[in-house]
C-alpha cells in the first residue's frame, strides 16, 4: 500500500493540470462531476489518514473549479452542456467538500435548491454517503447567494458566463465557449453559445448523445481525427451548434478558438471568440 500511495502522489498532479490556470474544466459540466469526485475523495482520504494531501488541493485552478461548476447551471436548472455533458444539471456531492474547504457557503446556493426539491432523488449516487461527512461541519441554513454575475476562465476550454441574477428562473443567462475539438470529450462547438431569458432557453446546445446508442451501432465514436466518424454524429458536429459553419465544412480538429475579450459592464455583456 505504501508503494501505491507513493506512486499516486507522483502521478496525480499530472491529472490536475486540466484545472489550470483559473478553474475552468475542459471537459465541461458532466465530466467535472465525474473526474473531480475521484480527486476529492483521494484528497479527503489522504487528509483523514495522514493529516495532509501533500499539496494536491493547491494545484492551480483546482479549488476555483467549484465556482466554475456553479456557473455552469443556468437559471432554468439545465446546464451549459458543451462537450459530452447532459442537458440536465444535477446535485454534486463534491460541492459540499469545496464549500467546507473554502469556507464559502455561497458555493452551495444551487445545490441547496436541489436538496429542497421534492422531486429530486439521490439514491443512485454512489457517493451519497459522503454528503453526511462533508456537511457535518456546515450550517446549511446560512447559505448565501454568490456575489458576482460573471465568470471567465482561460485554459484549454475558455468559457465566459453572464448571469443576470441568482434568484429567478427568468434571469438572463449567456454562456460562450472557445477551445478546440481536439480536447478530451469535445464537440465541434468552438465559438458556440447558449442564451436564456424569461425562463426560456432561446439558443441551445443539444448536449451529448448516449454512448451506448452510438457504440451499439458500430460508430467509431473515439476516432477524433479530422475525418473520424465521431463528427458524423449530428449533435457533435459544428452544424448542430450556435457557431460559424462555412460551406458546410467541418471545423478543423486541430484548430483553437481563444476568447480574446470579455465585456462585463452594465451596457455591454459578452465575449469575443
Task: Tell where the protein language model's regions lie, with residue ranges.
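Catalytic core of carbohydrate-active enzymes
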Residues: 173-262
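Conserved aromatic-histidine-acidic binding/catalytic patches
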Residues: 23-31, 54-57, 232
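Active-site lining segments of carbohydrate-active enzymes
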Residues: 1-30, 131-147
